[in-house]
Amino acid sequence: VTKWDWEACMTVPENQWGYHKDWSLSYVKTPIEVIDRIVHAVSMGGNMVVNFGPQPDGDFRSEEKELAMALGCWMKRYGECIYGCDYAGWDKQDWGYYTRKGQEVYMVVFNRPYSGLLKVKVPKGTEIERAVLPDGQVVKVTETARNEYNVAMPSQDPGEPFIIKLQVKEASGATDGYRDALT
C-alpha cells in the first residue's frame, strides 16, 4: 500500500502479451484467479489492467470471450466492491479481502470457513453497525472481543466469490466496553 497511484498489469496466459497463436505453452488463468487479482489490487489501493490479445482479424479467442463474460457477470453482481473503492486499512483475513468506499467496507469472500463465520478484526475505535448482502438481506454480526467480530455467512453458497457490505462507524478517542487485564 502506497500513497502514490499504482497499477498492476497481467496477461491471461502467463507471460504472453498481445496475440499468441499457441496457448498450450503456458498456464491460462481462470475467471476466479483473475477476479482474485483484481480485488487484491483494489484492496491495496491499486488498479489492475487485464491484457486480452486480439487475433490478427481483430476478434478475440473464444477462451478470452468466455473469461470476459464471466468477469462481466461477476462485476455486474458485485462491482460495487471495486468501482470507486480503495484500501480499507484493515488487516487482511484468510477468507479474502477488504475494500472501502466512504463509511462502507466490503468483505470480498473467496474462502468459506467451515464454521460459517467470518472473523473480522477492525481498527481501534471502529464499530460494525450493520452487515448486508448485495440483495439487502441483513447478515448477523456478533462482537466477540475488543475490535473483533464474527460475521455470519449466507446460508446459500453462491458458488463464487461474494461480498458482504459492512456499514461502519468510526469514533476518534472512543472507548469500548472492555478493560485491559491488570498485571
Name these PLM-found stretches:
Residues 1-183:
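Mature catalytic domains of secreted/periplasmic carbohydrate-active enzymes
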